[in-house]
Amino acid sequence: MSILRINDMAPNFDANTTHGKISFHDWLSESWGILFSHPKDFTPVCTTELGYMAKIEKEFTKRNCKIIGLSVDPLDDHEKWSLDIEETQGSKVNYPMISDEDLSVAKLYNMLPSEEVNDGNRTAMTNATVRSIFLIDPNKKIRMMLTYPMTTGRNFDEILRVLDSIQLTSKNKVATPANWKKNDDVIIAPAVSDEEAKDLFGEFRKIKPYLRYTKIDSND
């Protein structure tokens, strides 16, 4: 099994989803994308996760980012469970969910825990994906990967924050500091000289030669 790393090309695949059959790269088109797996339908933590993602999906849409979920459950379960999510979490799931019953995508993206992935005889009936998230850019490159244990629900506001950071730093010679949020000051890249920094950003605060802050409109 290949090991995926940041800046690798996101593997393409065909899959059955609640929105019909897709080819992943074609579905992404020119958008950013979030591919995230959950262990099992009709489970409590997953219900809260998918409900919250449904609630904030519009924020990803504003940023030209599509969302797609995945588990090894059949499509019928996805569709029935979506009704429970809407009932209990107050948000309708409008993004597609992949039914990966043969584990092909889970294995392609290393979404299975080690005690399960090492047994070639395991099936969807005995496997459950961990809580993995992949952020993919319009060039189909993996820009961020996160994996949580099954017992810990994810912070999807953090995923949105990372998307904001990566979109901003992809267009500007900057990085974002610890706990950065959209429209906070950013750090000028060390490779940028003071002279170039003045040309690019105008005013900036110099704490150390390697630590310089400036402000950039995150909506640019």
Predicted regions mapped to residue ranges:
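Chalcogenol-based redox active-site neighborhoods
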Residues: 1-220
